[in-house]
């Protein structure tokens, strides 16, 4: 097994039902999938980084067609078993060079994974496979919030201004929203500096991604099992805030809905 390969990291960081994670993280997962379900109705959908089986049944039932890709063979193999009986298509594929024909999808979804990709190659491919007027929907961590930590294996994080610029370069019309405001900004800013040094030593120097992940999980408190069904997740009443000036240093999660303007 290629322990430190990108595919291995993708498999390790995929959130599967039954996995133990900090309770607060359930809110992030539930929120992003419920946002997606509001966009799925009668659409041909492509989910990039399909990974986990969370909300697959709901997406399949709402959509006209569901297609999912993941670069990890292990993720797709497990997903095929857990989604047996659902009318969907799953492939091992690279989001930077996809197998699909032009103008194939109404909606492309990329949840909490765009920072693992070459953004320009990714957007070029999404532009190609989206139908005119189609939607790219993704969520990502806000790099401008104090306390931000990059994920092991990630390539690059963009702030909202940078996202706006590159999306418009590819002729998308983006709308941004922020969710889950950070607390104690000043205190977290100082704490983040210390944590970044610790992380650099564990991940970059020692190469121990799994140790860092476990340490971060324990720092967030007690762990809980990820439910199998989306309606078993805790109810999330988080209200999103529209971001109009392309700058935000408060919200931990950024949601972007971009229309294919071509």
Annotated model-derived regions:
Residues 109:
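A conserved beta-strand element that flanks and buttresses the S-adenosyl-L-methionine
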Residues 172-183:
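Conserved S-adenosyl-L-methionine
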Residues 1-40, 43-51, 58:
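Conserved class I S-adenosyl-L-methionine
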Residues 147-165:
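Acceptor-substrate binding/catalytic loop of class I
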Residues 52-97:
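Class I SAM-dependent methyltransferase SAM/SAH-binding core
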Residues 137, 184-262:
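A C-terminal cap/extension of S-adenosyl-L-methionine-dependent methyltransferases
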Residues 121-135:
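A short glycine-rich, Lys/Arg-flanked "PGG" loop and its adjoining helix->strand segment in the class I
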């Amino acid at each position: 097994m290629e322990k430190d390969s990108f595919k291995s990291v993708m498999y390790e960081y995929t959130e599967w039902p039954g996995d133990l994670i900090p309770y607060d993280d359930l809110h992030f997962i539930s929120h992003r999938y419920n946002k997606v379900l509001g966009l799925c109705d009668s659409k041909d959908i492509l989910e990039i980084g399909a990974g986990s089986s969370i909300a697959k049944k709901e997406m399949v039932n709402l959509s006209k067609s569901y297609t999912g890709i993941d670069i990890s063979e292990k993720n797709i193999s497990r997903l095929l078993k857990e989604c047996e009986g659902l009318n969907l298509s799953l492939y091992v594929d690279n989001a930077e060079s996809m197998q699909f024909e032009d103008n194939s999808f109404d909606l492309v979804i990329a949840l909490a994974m765009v920072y693992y990709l070459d953004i320009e190659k990714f957007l070029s491919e999404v532009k190609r496979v989206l139908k005119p007027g189609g939607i790219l929907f993704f969520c990502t961590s806000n790099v401008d919030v104090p306390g931000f930590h990059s994920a092991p294996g990630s390539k690059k994080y963009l702030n909202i201004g940078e996202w706006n610029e590159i999306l418009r370069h590819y002729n998308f019309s983006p709308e941004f929203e922020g969710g889950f405001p950070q607390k104690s900004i000043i205190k977290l800013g100082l704490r983040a500096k210390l944590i970044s040094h610790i992380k650099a030593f564990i991940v970059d120097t020692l190469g121990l991604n799994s140790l860092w992940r476990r340490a971060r999980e324990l720092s967030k408190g007690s762990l809980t099992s990820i439910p199998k069904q989306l309606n078993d997740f805790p109810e999330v009443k988080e209200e999103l805030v529209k971001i109009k000036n392309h700058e935000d240093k408060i919200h931990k999660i950024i949601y972007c809905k971009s229309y294919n303007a071509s």
